[in-house]
Amino acid sequence: MSPKELAEAVNKRRTFAIISHPDAGKTTITEQLLLFGGVVREAGTVKARKTGNFAKSDWMEIEKKRGISVTSSVMQFDFQGKRINILDTPGHEDFSEDTYRTLMAVDSAVMVIDSAKGIEPQTKKLFQICKMRGIPIFTFMNKFDRDAREPLDLLNEVEDVLGIETYPINWPIGSGHQFKGIYDRFNHRVALTHPADENNPYLPLDEDGNVEGDNPLAGDGEWQDAMDGMELVEVAGNELDQEKIAKGDQTPVFFGSALTNFGVQTFLETYLQFAPAPSDHKTEDGDVVKPLDPEFSGFVFKIQANMNPRHRDRIAFVRICSGEFDRGMDVTLSRTKKPMRLSNVTEFMADTRENVETAVAGDIIGLYDTGNFQIGDSIYNGKKDIQFEKLPQFTPELFVRVSAKNVMKQKSFHKGINQLVQEGAVQLYRSYSTGDYILGAVGQLQFEVFKFRMQNEYNSEVVMEPMGTKTARWIDPDQLDEKMSSSRNILVKDIHDQPLFLFENQFAENWFKQKYPDVKLTAKL
C-alpha cells in the first residue's frame, strides 16, 4: 500500500468505546448502530430472555443468562464511507479494569446516560479516564421514550459534575408518552416519532429555525417547551467549538431513545463529522508513534479465552497504532524480543469472526494466542524496539482460596484457571507455605463469573473459600524472609513469581512496617 493509500485508509477509521453506568442502555445503542451498519437485521433485546434473542455484543453465556455485559466486545462495520470499530465495554464496576484498558485502545468515547437518572457513579469514573486521556467524548441522553428529567437539568449536571462544556446537537420534544420527536438544530430538521408519512419522518427548518410549511406540532405544549428550551440554549449556551471537542473539553449532546431507535441515526451521522481519525500513541521512552508511520506496530489490550468454547481457543486483541498489517507478516514481540509470524488473524462481530488479509492503524484485530501474549504486550515489524505505555492494572481488594471440587478434574482445573487469569479480570497467587491457589479481584461479581465459566467452559466445578478484604503489597525479593509471614500478613507470589504480602487490615500493615522499617512495600509492581 502506497503512503497515499495508507493515509486514505487510516483517515476512514473511527474507533470508539461506549461507556455508561449499568442499565443506561449502552448495549442497546450498540445494537442499533449495528443495524445502520447492515450487520444485523434486528437488534437483540437484552431483557427478552424467553425469545433467545440476545444482544449481539453480549455473546458470553453468562451475559445472556444475566443480561449484563462482563467483557468488552469488538464490532466492526462500514457506514457512509467510514470503517467504524466499536468497543462495547462492561458497565458493571467490578469489571472496570477491562473497561479502562479498552479506553486506552480507542480514539473517542460515547457516554450513554439514562435521562431519568442523570450522571451515575460508574459513568463519572469512566468519564475521568477519558478526560485524563484527552479524547473526545460524545454524549447520548437515552430513554426519552420514558419519563425523563428536563433537558436543561441534564446539561447543567454534565457541566457541573463532570466539568465539561455541553453543546446540544438536538433537543427533545417531550418525553415518555408525550415524546413527539427531536428538534435537530445541527441538521436543520425536526424528526417526528409518529410522522404522517413513515417514509419521510422529517420536517425541514428554514434559516430562522422555524418549520417550513405546515407544522403538525404547532400549538402543542411539548413543542412550545422545546422551543423555549432551544431559545435559551441559543442565547445563553456554549458556542460549538471543534477544537474543544477534539481536546475533550466540550461534548456534543444528543437526545433520543436507543430502544425505539430514535435519534440514533442522527447521532451516528453527526458523530462521523466530528470524531477523530486514529491518533498518536506514546511509548514508554517518551517517543510518539504516528498512525501514518509506515512500519506496523500495535499493543495487546485484551485477551479472551473461549470465544469459541468448542475449540477452547484464546484471542489476543490488538489495537493497530501505525502502518499496515498484512497476513503472514513477521513481527517482534517487544517483551521477549522474539520474532513471530502473524498468519492466523481475525476481525470481529462480537463472537463472529472473519479472517483478515490486511488492516491499518485504528483497526482492532485478533491474534490466535497459544500462550505467547500478555495484556500490555507491544508488537512491531520495524528495526526500532517499540514498547507502548503500560496499561492500567488494579490492585485486588477481595481474595478467595480456590480449588477443584473433583480431584479427578485437576487437568481441566489447571487449564481453566491459567487461561482465565490471562484475561486479567482476576489475579492469581500461590501461597508460599501451602501452595494453595488464591484469586484476587476488585469485586465479588468477578469471582461469580470465574466460577460460572470454569464449570461452563472447562467442566471444572470449583470450591471458593472467602478470605475477605486484604491489602496487597509487593516486596523486593532481595529483602524477603519467609519468617516475616504470619496469619495477619500472608506471604504469596504472583504469576510472575514476585512475592507479596496480603495484609489483614491497615493495622497489620502498619505493625509490619514498624517491625521491618527497612523493608519497602509497594502497592503495584
Curated annotation (Swiss-Prot):
InterPro entries from the UniProt entry: EF-G-like_DII, EFG_III/V, G_TR_CS, P-loop_NTPase, PrfC, RF3_C, RF3_dom_3_sf, RF3_GTP-bd
GO biological process: one example: regulation of translational termination
One Pfam match: EF-G_D2
Residues bound to GTP: 20-27, 88-92, 142-145
Main location: cytoplasm
Disulfide bonds: none
GO CC annotations on file: cytosol
Keywords attached to this entry: Cytoplasm, GTP-binding, Nucleotide-binding, Protein biosynthesis
Location(s) in or outside the cell: Cytoplasm
Residue ranges annotated for the tr-type G domain, each copy included: 11-279
UniProt xrefs under Gene3D superfamilies: P-loop containing nucleotide triphosphate hydrolases, Peptide chain release factor 3, domain III, Translation factors
One term of GO molecular function: translation release factor activity, codon nonspecific
Family membership: Belongs to the TRAFAC class translation factor GTPase superfamily. Classic translation factor GTPase family. PrfC subfamily.
Function text: Increases the formation of ribosomal termination complexes and stimulates activities of RF-1 and RF-2. It binds guanine nucleotides and has strong preference for UGA stop codons. It may interact directly with the ribosome. The stimulation of RF-1 and RF-2 is significantly reduced by GTP and GDP, but not by GMP.
Protein name stated in the entry: Peptide chain release factor 3
Naturally occurring in which organism (per UniProt): Limosilactobacillus reuteri (strain DSM 20016) (Lactobacillus reuteri)
